[in-house]
Amino acid sequence: SSDLSHYLQLLELAAAACDEPCFGLKLGSQQSMSTVGLIGAYMSRQPTILDALNVAQKYIYLHAEGIVLNLALYGQNSCEVRFVRLSDEKQEFVQKAQLAVCLVNKVMKELVGPKWRADKVCLRQSPVSEHTALFAKVLGCEVEFNADTDAIYFSSAFLTYKPKLNDAILDTLIADQLEMQRINKLPDEMLHIESAMKMLLATGDCSKENT
């Protein structure tokens, strides 16, 4: 969409204006579960991490249109979350890739807990020589540059973990949603109701029978 294209351009322009090649990485390191709003809350209520990732794979476009997650087993003991649509015919969106990888890493850390650690992160971008160590430090794992894809790899054992349900995070998510609605109050309140119903109907937690 044009809005997505505009946002991605802004992200790249901000990095250039600040002369900060790690803009997306640093921005991503400041994100948390609350960043993905209702999707994060729904992920934390799933029975396993696999189910939570399936939620992300299915609904992430509601939060970040144009981003698609592909979840797949990689070998016998590894899992891959691949980020697609981070580029178009004209350019690579380097900062968006940094932000997406970092955000998923942060969300997984919150869902899994202290045991979380990615095995490797792959980025299609070229390495930024003086900042290479920062990538490994922020992501907490080996980072491979000039890769064929933007992806994060981790032990498939994590897929069976039960997501940590943090009531404080859920309270924050709800409060943030309410505050956003207060600040950005739309003239047509039905838009909010329609949006919420679409989200609930999509997840299956709401049906015409129980509304």
Segments predicted by a language model, with ranges:
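Residue-level recognition of alpha-helical structural elements
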Residues: 3, 45, 89-93, 189, ...
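Generic solvent-exposed, charged/amphipathic alpha-helical segments
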Residues: 12-15, 53, 57, 101-105, ...
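Extended mid-to-C-terminal alpha-helical interaction segments
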Residues: 133-211
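Solvent-exposed amphipathic alpha-helical surface segments
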Residues: 21, 63, 111, 115, ...
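Short, well-ordered alpha-helical segments
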Residues: 50, 94-102, 168, 172, ...
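Short hinge/gating elements
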Residues: 37-43, 86-90, 160, 179
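N-terminal low-complexity or simple alpha-helical regulatory segments
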Residues: 1-82
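DNA-contacting interfaces and partner/effector-binding or oligomerization modules
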Residues: 68-159
